[in-house]
Amino acid sequence: MGKRIISQNRGKGTPTYRAPSHRYKTDAKLLRFKDEVVAAKVIDIQHDSARNGPVALVKLPDGSETYILAVEGLGTGDVVYAGDNVEIASGNITYLKNIPEGTPVCNIEAQPGDGGKFIRASGTFGFVVSREADKVLVQMPSGKQKWFHPNCRAMIGVVAGGGRTDKPFVKAGKKYHKMKSKAAKWPRVRGVAMNAVDHPFGGGKHQHVGKPKTVSRNAPPGRKVGSIAARRTGVRR
């Protein structure tokens, strides 16, 4: 019997595959509001290893502090407003039903009150396309259009940190430090590059799979690699 392959080790769960969430600063939820408009002053813009975009540390009227996602153009000293009747300006938070068509939005709630689930990555934004009495249509960054409840809240603007992917890592060491903050094992070694004891595709005089790559859905752990229960393989013609 060979060694456990990576997918088996990941299932067991070890620090290698566990996100270092004790180093994460915040969930970066939307500011809560009821009947009154909440004004929050931006104290600082900070990096959070949990996400790609920066977060803004804001001070609430009661003196408490919390984090929100930072949008493009937001800086220290700015004031962010959250409420039912707020100005349609970058950084403000309100219900989708109040946002005009064509307005860029981010950090949209999946269900009213959950604090924001969609469009949170750096440089991303969606558009309000249209609205009906009981739902609002938003175009997502992927181009797909999705309906939301009109009482789902959203932040107006574009998530800061756009253009992050334009700059190459250049050195493997920089990529290493980035991946250390994620729940990911890196670098990712190909199965055919391993020894036979480490992977079903490993071993041999040269790098080749050496056996059918398709495998049964009922294959045992450790053999279940490749094209799992594939209906077809090869280039679709």
UniProtKB/Swiss-Prot annotation:
- Give the CC-aspect GO terms: cytosolic large ribosomal subunit
User: Which residues fall in a coiled-coil region?
Assistant: none
- Keyword Chloroplast applies: no
Write out the entry's keywords from A to Z: Ribonucleoprotein, Ribosomal protein, RNA-binding, rRNA-binding
Q: Where are the compositionally biased (Polar residues) regions? A: 1-11
The answer to whether keyword Nucleotidyltransferase applies is no
BP-aspect Gene Ontology terms: cytoplasmic translation
A Gene Ontology molecular-function term? rRNA binding
Q: Name one Pfam family in it.
A: Ribosomal_L2
Under the heading Gene3D superfamilies, the entry gives: 2.30.30.30, Nucleic acid-binding proteins, Ribosomal protein L2, domain 3
Which SUPFAM superfamilies does the entry link to?
Answer: Nucleic acid-binding proteins, Translation proteins SH3-like domain
Q: What does this protein do?
A: One of the primary rRNA binding proteins. Required for association of the 30S and 50S subunits to form the 70S ribosome, for tRNA binding and peptide bond formation. It has been suggested to have peptidyltransferase activity; this is somewhat controversial. Makes several contacts with the 16S rRNA in the 70S ribosome.
Describe its assembly.
Answer: Part of the 50S ribosomal subunit. Forms a bridge to the 30S subunit in the 70S ribosome.
Q: This chain belongs to which protein, by name?
A: Large ribosomal subunit protein uL2
- Native organism: Archaeoglobus fulgidus (strain ATCC 49558 / DSM 4304 / JCM 9628 / NBRC 100126 / VC-16)
Gene designation per UniProt:
rpl2
